[in-house]
Amino acid sequence: MVSKFKILVPQPRSRFLLVRCPVCGNEQVIFSHATFPARCLVCGAQLVEPTGGKAKILGQVVRVLG
């Protein structure tokens, strides 16, 4: 494991996620630290519940992007 002081350029811990809607099955890209409740573009179901930091994902994470 690399110590904190040897990392010269820190990488962000937030990611974009491809999430599948539990109601209709639509796949949509959302941000892992979303501050606003994201809804499905097809059926309108809520996919993300914002918390203080990392958002609570209400759908199924298909893939982590970037």
Curated annotation (Swiss-Prot):
- Binding of Zn(2+), residues: C21, C24, C40, C43
List the cysteine pairs that form cystine.
Answer: none
Q: Which cofactor does it need?
A: Zn(2+)
Gene3D superfamilies xrefs = Zn-binding ribosomal proteins
* Keyword presence, Ribonucleoprotein: yes
Q: Where are the zinc fingers (C4-type)?
A: 21-43
Q: Which UniProt keywords apply?
A: Metal-binding, Ribonucleoprotein, Ribosomal protein, Zinc, Zinc-finger
Query: What Pfam families does the entry give?
Result: Ribosomal_S27e
| Co-factor remark | Binds 1 zinc ion per subunit.
Q: Some GO term, biological process aspect, for this entry: which one?
A: translation
PROSITE patterns from the UniProt entry: RIBOSOMAL_S27E (PS01168)
GO cellular component terms given for this protein: ribonucleoprotein complex; ribosome
Q: Does the keyword Ribonucleoprotein apply?
A: yes
**Which GO molecular function entries does the Swiss-Prot or TrEMBL record give?**
structural constituent of ribosome; zinc ion binding
How does the record describe its quaternary structure? Part of the 30S ribosomal subunit.
What is stated as this protein's family in its record? Belongs to the eukaryotic ribosomal protein eS27 family.
Q: What is this protein called?
A: Small ribosomal subunit protein eS27
User: What is the organism of origin for this protein?
Assistant: Hyperthermus butylicus (strain DSM 5456 / JCM 9403 / PLM1-5)
